[in-house]
Amino acid sequence: MSTPSSRKTAITPVHNSPRDGAGPTDDGGDPQQQVREPEALDPTQQVWMARTTLLILNLLLLLGNLIHLFADEPHEPSHPIFSRPAWNGDYDESHIEILGHVQLVAATIMLLFLWITRHAAVYGVWALVILAITVDDLLQIHERGGAVLVSALGLPAVAGLWPQDLGELLVWAAMAFVLGIVLVIGHLRAPRYAGGDFWLLAGLVAFLAMFGVGVDQLHVIVEPHVPPLAGTALALLETSGELVFMTLIVLAVHQMAIRPKMPLRSAPRHPGNLSR
């Protein structure tokens, strides 16, 4: 007879609780597979995330421009970051100007894709127009052309504008005339579904020109007659308006690309033609 001390104790397997995360769950699944990963953002959320990010980036650069204007005052202490000229959006090759050019180039590329995929030349026409605006600003074509006109024609000062400013206006007018003809042809040949896109881009580009040309020349005319703070405010208004409408252009083109396809409406049948 075996004594109690010599008996083998039966070992009962111990199952860890599912909350411990070390053993199988009651339904036999792997506990690591029971933890659901967060779902991806739906397409609408992704679009709004990208748009909000771009708008916040615009606001941050405009805020940097505003800080620069205060830090750049003669009696203000120099700021180690924002006193640099690149923060002034009124200067060429500034941070704001570079961001604006990037956005216009992105809009141009997307318009070319729309032209190819939808077989609508009106998108290609708008790509040409926006590219021309970008190249003109990037290579300073209107400034160089204005200087050539001043040298060749001896342009006078008119209505508070310097001869150079008048020459730039003439170059802009010539560019607008040529591009306007191209736009009219593109609009006349545009499919019906692209009509709204045409007028939306026309409005946005018109506002961009209003700030880039109109407010710019107004600044030149009134600056000698207003306090420095008013001149600074006009410069900031021009910079803000240009950047905002460049951003709206790229957002509008992106919306044209992602919107659902509109169903074609069939012509209503005349009651007299209904089969009986």
Language-model features: locations:
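Membrane-interface helix-boundary motifs at transmembrane edges
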Residues: F113-Y123, H187-W199
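Interfacial helix-loop-helix junctions of multi-pass membrane proteins
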Residues: H142-A152, Q217-E238
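C-terminal transmembrane-bundle signature of multipass membrane proteins
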Residues: F211-I221, H225, L237-L274
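Membrane-proximal helix-loop-helix units in multi-pass membrane proteins
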Residues: V135-V182
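Hydrophobic cores of alpha-helical transmembrane segments in multi-pass inner/ER membrane proteins
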Residues: G100-L111, A173-V182, S240-A257
